[in-house]
Amino acid sequence: MTQEGRIIKIAGPVIIAEGMRGSQMYEMVKVGEDKLIGEIIELEGDTATIQVYEETAGIKPGETVERTGGPLSVELGPGILGSIFDGIQRPLENIKALTGDYIERGVDVPSLPKDKKWTFKPTAREGQMVKGGDIIGEVEETSSITHRIMIPPNVEGKLTMIAPQGEYTVLDDIAEVETESGTEKIQMLQKWPVRKGRPYKKKLDPDVPLVTGQRAQDTFFSVAKGGTAAIPGPFGSGKTVTQQQLAKWADADIIVYVGCGERGNEMTEVLKEFPELEDPKTGNPLMDRTVLIANTSNMPVAAREACVYTGITIAEYFRDMGYDVALMADSTSRWAEAMREISGRLEEMPGEEGYPAYLASRLAQFYERAGRVTTIGSEDKIASVSVVGAVSPPGGDLSEPVTQNTLRICKVFWALDASLADKRHFPSIDWLQSYSLYIDSVQEWWASNVDPEWRKFRDEAMALLQKEAELQEIVQLVGPDALPDRERITLETTRMIREDFLQQNAYHEVDTYCSPSKQFEMLRTIIMFHRNATAALEKGAPAADIISLPVKEDIGRMKYIPEEEFPARIKEIQERIVKECSEV
């Protein structure tokens, strides 16, 4: 069995090599004299088709292809949090120290620091029976997160040795397990192939909302922990800011942010902002619980596929520890475009708009790895991976294949609308096009943790927004003054819902995050105004007087009231609504 093949054909990121008999699908190889990292994606006879994750310019036929014998894998262990990796888990800061501002081809840097010592604290005893997923020790990796050291998924047996508390590197043996096939030495470092999902005991119903602090998402289009959401929208509609808001404020324990084929300056913004931001829950830097994977548009196309899988594998690893993880992929369209390019190089039959026929199944494989699960191990830990994928349809056309296939898989659809963004309505989530299929699942949580009437108020507000859309056609023809008074009150209420509730300023220190109880009280106040105004109208009050009530100014400003002052101030506003409406 030869361990080396020879290049016979090169087409951009795709290379065909002969003499590769005995290799396996998705095996990792090192291509050419520069030892560029690649992955076998097709085997026929003794020829292998390889996609290369680095720039292939300058490689020539006849150069060697060296097999590694294993699939493309990520290294999992202390040192992941707070790091910035490229698509194949090479730490960018270390590469910069080695090669300067530009990544040189074939640069080989260990994913995790091998010489750094971590303080290991054992939590298991010698002699106890352990199996995959059991926690045997802890490492204080950052000020926010304790890294739990687990037995690898495929190991089961008796713990014969565990290291005492002390300083160890990720390669030091910290435990030994006596299995049926011999003694397994356990290190803090684990390797896992990126294309294979990590195992779990069972999937659970997603019935706990992922609270994001964004009113439009939480109240109207909730995503559950372990759920999947898609954010399609044209250029400039606010996809990246929406993703960054979720990364900052979502109540997940760990955030994995994958910049997949987006512009370099957007990733730079994340890299500059996140280290300065404070985690609202702990007061520590937000980077302490974040992993960034940067694979910008000027990096090699093939690595986009790897970066999405790298991100989800890291997310599953932290899920297995018992943490709730949120993964932001920005943007899955760039990954689909990479698939289209490689499919074209392979001369495969194109599907719709040139995308490969397997586009839907690849997207599904990725999103299906999200979920709220009972993790493997002796203890039943409940943890989740929630995935939010941005989609950038060319020209904002939501009927294109990537958006349509994503919609079939995801249960939450936050449609961003360019016309709303042009009106400076942010987040520009179109309340008529968007939907969430988790509303029925999460209403129990809202009822028991916030208010039993949450669903009633939410549905009433949605019905009013639908009614406004119907009335808009008449308004455009004859103007608002020609409408009956009841309809004018409806239009005024929906204007308040749009401007005072749905609009949210990501850069305002108070309005950037809105707690579930504040969201509910704000919505209740607006609906309360509508009900009292309608009652006043029926008693004969003129619509013009109701619309110009002074309390409306306070309703408009309620989103800027700090959380600690909010309960008292909102009560006062609600009392004024009742008083002013009854006195009209």
Swiss-Prot record:
Gene name, Swiss-Prot/TrEMBL: atpA
Keywords: ATP synthesis, ATP-binding, Cell membrane, Hydrogen ion transport, Ion transport, Membrane, Nucleotide-binding, Translocase, Transport
Pfam families according to UniProt: ATP-synt_ab, ATP-synt_ab_N, ATP-synt_ab_Xtn, ATP-synt_VA_C
Binding residues annotated for ATP, in chain numbering: G233, P234, F235, G236, S237, G238, K239, T240
Membrane topology field: Peripheral membrane protein
Organism of this sequence: Methanothermobacter thermautotrophicus (strain ATCC 29096 / DSM 1053 / JCM 10044 / NBRC 100330 / Delta H)
A single GO BP: proton motive force-driven plasma membrane ATP synthesis
Protein name: A-type ATP synthase subunit A
Family listed: Belongs to the ATPase alpha/beta chains family.
PANTHER family: H(+)-TRANSPORTING TWO-SECTOR ATPASE, V-TYPE PROTON ATPASE CATALYTIC SUBUNIT A
Entry keyword Electron transport: no
Assigned EC number: 7.1.2.2
One CC-aspect GO term: proton-transporting two-sector ATPase complex, catalytic domain
Oligomeric and partner information: Has multiple subunits with at least A(3), B(3), C, D, E, F, H, I and proteolipid K(x).
Molecular-function GO terms, alphabetical: ATP binding; proton-transporting ATP synthase activity, rotational mechanism; proton-transporting ATPase activity, rotational mechanism
Source domain of life: Archaea
Catalytic activities: ATP + H2O + 4 H(+)(in) = ADP + phosphate + 5 H(+)(out)
Location of the protein in the cell: Cell membrane
HAMAP family reported for this sequence: ATP_synth_A_arch
Function, as annotated: Component of the A-type ATP synthase that produces ATP from ADP in the presence of a proton gradient across the membrane. The A chain is the catalytic subunit.
